[in-house]
Each structure stands twice: as C-alpha cells, then as structure tokens.
Amino acid sequence: MNKSRVVVGMSGGVDSSVAALLLKQQGYDVTGLFMKNWEEDDTDEYCSSRQDFLDAASVADILDIPLEVVNFSTEYRERVFNLFLKEYQAGRTPNPDVLCNSEIKFRAFLDHALNLGADWIATGHYAQVHETDGLFQLLKGEDGNKDQSYFLYRLNQQQLSHTIFPIGHLYKREVRKIAREHRLPNSTKKDSTGICFIGERPFREFLNRYLPANPGEIHTLDDQVVGEHLGVMYYTIGQRQGLGIGGTRQGSEQPWFVSGKDIKKNVLYVVQGHDHPALLRSSLTAADLSWISGTPPHQNWVYAAKIRYRQTDAPCAITHFEHDSCQIGFAAPQWGITPGQSVVVYESKVCLGGGVIIGSND
C-alpha cells in the first residue's frame, strides 16, 4: 500500500471528487481541501460556493477522508484579481484561470499542503505529468475535448514534481461513470464555466463594479461611426455579441465583430463578416514567457500552438527571442488573436509553456 500523503483540491465538482476516490483506492493517505478564494458578493443568486462546499463535504464523508477549508481570498486578490483588473484597464483581455492555477492552486495551495506534511497535491484537471530522469513534463489530458494543459502552462518543475492528476488518463464520460458507480452525489453535476472562483455571474455586470462604464464611439476601419460602446475594456477582439449594431446603410447584413481598440481615443473598431482580413493575423508577439522545463524551445523548429482554449493546434515556429518576449509565426493566419490571452506551445502531446500575447502582425 502507498502511504504517501496527498492533499486533494476538492471543488465540489465531479472531477476532483473522482480524483480523491481514485487516490484513496490506490492506497494514498488522502486529505481533501476546499479553497475559498472570493469573499465579496457571496450571494445565492450568483455564487454557488456554499453548495460546492456541501458537495465536497458530502463526497469526503462518503470516502471517509478529512476535509479542510482554507481561505486564500487575500492571495487571490493580490496575485490574481488585481492584475486581472489592471490588464482590463489597459485594454487587454486576461485569462484569470491561468494565473489562478499558477498562483493559487499550484502555489498557495501547494505551499499549504507541504506545510501540512503532504508529499503531493492533486486536482481534477484533465492533464498528465510524466517524469524522465528527473525532468517533469506536462502532457495533454487523454480526453481532447477536456484537456486543460492550456491553463497549466505556467507551472514549473518544482510544482509539477509534487503534483498528481489522477483523472488525466480518463475521458469525461468515464469519470462520470466512476462517480455513478460509487454513488457520489455530484455524478451529474454540470461543469463550471465561470471565471475561476468568481462563478457564473454576468461578466460585464461584475466588471462594472470595479471598472465603471466609459461610453464612446464604435467606428468602422474607415472611421464611420456605427454605434456607441459602454467602455472599450468590456470588449474583446473577435467579439460578436453585445455590440448593439445592425447592418450598414449600404445594406450588408453580415454580423459585426470587434477588430481593435484604441484606449486613448476610447474608440472601439469593428468589421463586418467573420472572415474579414482585419481579424486574421500571421504572427504574434508574446511576453512574460514561462517554459516548463526551464529552457526555451528551439528557434525556427516546427511546433504547434493554441491562442485560446479548445482551439485546434496550429502549426507554428518561434522565429525570434528577445529578453522575455518572442515572435511566433503561424503556417496559416489565425483568427482573433487577442492581447492579454495566452499562447501555449506544444510538441505533440507535450506542453512546453508559453506567454501572454501583447500584439499581432499581418
């Protein structure tokens, strides 16, 4: 029997519950940990945190494992949320789940678990860790539709060396089947789709509490005024919904898409048609780079990259490195490259790391 001690981050969802179950079956000394990372506005209307805790507690009781509750709200605000707001103020569209993983789930949580005397932490992420000669690799989850390696690209060797992903080799349907077979109460619970630890509340309404509306004009690329926006920080490149404008006077009924933002002028730029050339770019610049092995990939080798979650891998090459930034060129133009989002580089199933997009080029 394996008596290594592992602390499992239990969110109340089916994935982390089955992760805890599998580790218990494998003989680990398992403790569950429920993270409370958001204090404000914890209302029944928007935040399911209370129900999530009850679900986690119910599963822990069934598995006969202890469940600890830890409040990381201070760390979350300082390490994740403040940067999240700063990026939006600058006109970029950040991915808080990436920061939440690297700073909270695999830093604050890991530090806490190690201080408790644990050997490992575990989560319900669809990803895998592989170790060869002391080098840890992050691999895609076996279920391509659920693979979450994109959100984990900022993890380092120390973090991966203490991490187990118990369901990374499974498909979602198999995870739910295991949960049903063991009569876990959350076997049919729907997946969370909200921002990490902020939940399912309407995003613009939430953001408005911290970044007040600043209305301005919506322009076409030839500076024809076609509408009014609520504040450029509320919109993202490629966005179609919520623009409030119809066809042009020339009669085109193609939908409008956000193609650019000018923070200084407070102007939102739009184009008509999903395949408009202004939405396609052949290369990007990324900064704040993070490579899992500690060493950058080779320049001008053929890799693959994702510029958003669940995107099909796009063949690419890293064409230039400079300080903490790089240029990535794609074999085919990419749609809707968005500053603030992450570009993540892969070699087959291995996630090499990536960076934050700061610009794009034709």
UniProtKB/Swiss-Prot annotation:
EC numbers for this chain: 2.8.1.13
UniProt xrefs under Pfam families: tRNA_Me_trans (PF03054), tRNA_Me_trans_C (PF20258), tRNA_Me_trans_M (PF20259)
Leading EC class: transferase
Location of region: Interaction with tRNA: 146-148, 308-309
Keyword tRNA processing found: yes
Database matches in PANTHER family: MITOCHONDRIAL TRNA-SPECIFIC 2-THIOURIDYLASE 1, TRNA 5-METHYLAMINOMETHYL-2-THIOURIDYLATE -METHYLTRANSFERASE
NCBIfam families given in the database record: PRK00143.1, trmU
Protein name according to UniProt: tRNA-specific 2-thiouridylase MnmA
